[in-house]
């Protein structure tokens, strides 16, 4: 388990220490810096809902450095981002791959960013199943439907034709930050923090 730094603040009641992520949450900053799975999705969703309850009119920043992960867990984050009232700004640091890239596109249009050396990768969903032939057929139909849903959302969020997204996601499709801007996944490559 990684060591999480602590920060100490002086208040009128004395000193107060926070882990760094809790301190950043006070500034409405959420980090997704791991695989997207049920546990990380629950944490991100809880933080989004908490920040909405604190101030429904103030933007939330979601920093993404993720290799991707579970579609259903990612869709829980995606749906919550769209469900809550505050705009969610997305910022790619490092890499946003697969579901990480999908969530990067899900930020409020005009508020989707990447740092200059960030890397973005989109592709079709991965899956694997074993068992009886009928079960394999059921899972195959499900993953094909998920691929169709994801591609439609990416096309809508980026402004790319659906046919292009289908072709580009057929295999791993890597982009540098500027290429992701041209594609429509992000709106701007930034070198300094946006306030």
UniProtKB/Swiss-Prot annotation:
<dbReference type="Pfam" id="PF00574">
    <property type="entry name" value="CLP_protease"/>
</dbReference>
<comment type="subunit">
    <text>Fourteen ClpP subunits assemble into 2 heptameric rings which stack back to back to give a disk-like structure with a central cavity, resembling the structure of eukaryotic proteasomes.</text>
</comment>
<keyword id="KW-0963">Cytoplasm</keyword>
<keyword id="KW-0720">Serine protease</keyword>
<protein>
    <recommendedName>
        <fullName>ATP-dependent Clp protease proteolytic subunit</fullName>
        <ecNumber>3.4.21.92</ecNumber>
    </recommendedName>
</protein>
<feature type="active site" description="Nucleophile">
    <location>
        <position position="98"/>
    </location>
</feature>
<keyword id="KW-0645">Protease</keyword>
<dbReference type="InterPro" id="IPR023562">
    <property type="entry name" value="ClpP/TepA"/>
</dbReference>
<dbReference type="GO" id="GO:0005737">
    <property type="term" value="C:cytoplasm"/>
</dbReference>
<dbReference type="InterPro" id="IPR018215">
    <property type="entry name" value="ClpP_Ser_AS"/>
</dbReference>
<keyword id="KW-0378">Hydrolase</keyword>
<dbReference type="GO" id="GO:0009368">
    <property type="term" value="C:endopeptidase Clp complex"/>
</dbReference>
<dbReference type="GO" id="GO:0004252">
    <property type="term" value="F:serine-type endopeptidase activity"/>
</dbReference>
<dbReference type="InterPro" id="IPR001907">
    <property type="entry name" value="ClpP"/>
</dbReference>
<feature type="active site">
    <location>
        <position position="123"/>
    </location>
</feature>
<comment type="function">
    <text>Cleaves peptides in various proteins in a process that requires ATP hydrolysis. Has a chymotrypsin-like activity. Plays a major role in the degradation of misfolded proteins.</text>
</comment>
<dbReference type="InterPro" id="IPR029045">
    <property type="entry name" value="ClpP/crotonase-like_dom_sf"/>
</dbReference>
<comment type="similarity">
    <text>Belongs to the peptidase S14 family.</text>
</comment>
<dbReference type="GO" id="GO:0006515">
    <property type="term" value="P:protein quality control for misfolded or incompletely synthesized proteins"/>
</dbReference>
<dbReference type="GO" id="GO:0051117">
    <property type="term" value="F:ATPase binding"/>
</dbReference>
<dbReference type="InterPro" id="IPR033135">
    <property type="entry name" value="ClpP_His_AS"/>
</dbReference>
<dbReference type="GO" id="GO:0004176">
    <property type="term" value="F:ATP-dependent peptidase activity"/>
</dbReference>
